[in-house]
Regions:
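Conserved, structured core segments of small domains
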Residues: 2-295
Length: 295
């Protein structure tokens, strides 16, 4: 080998916070008698009714503690306070459910009809930890998005440290998934049998140049552990754009993802990740609930 030969350089994005290995997502409805008042409080600072105000302070205190200790990964309401999405980082599903049951809003039936799933985030791949990141990067090398190297050649890794910043707008899309067909495709791939071209197109749609990950449209995306759902949180400017991205996914076009729901979502917990449009209101409300505000 030439003495002037230099190993290839591969850039690796390293975030300040890695997505936990296990996440449990909870969707719940908000009591229609409380939602409009909460909406006005966060939109214009209007005072809550006395009973709801005290309950809300206890709810915020409960969630703030869980956000600070890492038990809540991300949590918050829809834009109009009709439903919530809470994502817990706990050892198991039952632990996550116990934390929700202890929420003052849940105990007072302000939250109800809760549905649960274990959630595995696949993209953005650079926000995930091992072994998920290695699996996704292996897929990217297999389809030519990342380079492959001959035996004996190892790249020099150039690290790019990034701070993950919550965007101004987030839109949740929860779609049902055809777990049977997805499992069959995965089994065919493992057995080196022919796979549908739309599987590769789906990977390119998410991971390739101009795809949703590379363009920054994926805040966090991936399947439920049982493959019955796909939960995608889009970082885009409008719900129409989120809908278009979902509809452009080859898995949607081929019927593997279907019946999607959409809503704008605000992160309230943990406070350090709060959506920009809610940060000032949360700072004020959290401060009101403390003898010595943290902010």
């Amino acid at each position: 080998m030439s003495q002037n030969w230099q190993s290839p350089v591969e850039r690796r994005i390293v975030p300040n916070e890695i997505i936990p290995a296990r996440l449990f997502a909870c969707f719940a409805d908000v009591d229609p008698s409380a939602g409009p008042a909460l909406d006005k409080t966060y939109a214009s600072g209007e005072d809550l009714p006395r009973a709801l105000s005290a309950l809300h302070r206890n709810h915020l205190s409960h969630n703030d503690r869980l956000g600070e200790n890492g038990s809540i990964w991300e949590a918050g309401p829809s834009a109009n306070f009709t439903r919530v999405l809470y994502i817990y980082a706990t050892p198991d599903m039952e632990s996550a459910k116990e934390l929700m049951r202890d929420d003052p809003f849940y105990r007072a039936s302000c939250f109800s009809n809760d549905g649960w799933m274990e959630w595995s985030v696949h993209t953005p791949y650079w926000k995930t930890g091992e072994p998920m990141r290695g699996m996704i990067e292996g897929l990217m090398r297999g389809i030519g998005v990342l380079p492959s190297y001959p035996a004996g050649v190892s790249p020099t890794i150039s690290v790019i440290n990034v701070e993950v910043v919550t965007p101004p707008k987030l839109f949740v899309s929860l779609a049902k998934a055809d777990a049977g067909r997805i499992k069959q495709i995965e089994n065919d791939d493992k057995a080196r049998r022919p796979i549908p071209s739309f599987l590769v197109q789906h990977a390119f749609n998410r991971l390739g140049p101009g795809g949703t990950t590379m363009m920054g449209y994926d805040w966090e995306c991936g399947p439920s552990a049982d493959s019955l759902y796909d939960l995608t949180i889009f970082s885009v400017g409008s719900i129409e754009m989120a809908r278009q991205l979902r509809e452009n996914d080859p898995f949607t076009q081929q019927g593997l993802f279907y019946d999607p729901e959409y809503f704008e979502w605000f992160i309230h917990t943990p406070f350090r990740k709060a959506s920009p449009g809610r940060r000032a209101a949360l700072e004020k409300l959290l401060g009101e609930g403390e003898q010595s505000p943290r902010f």
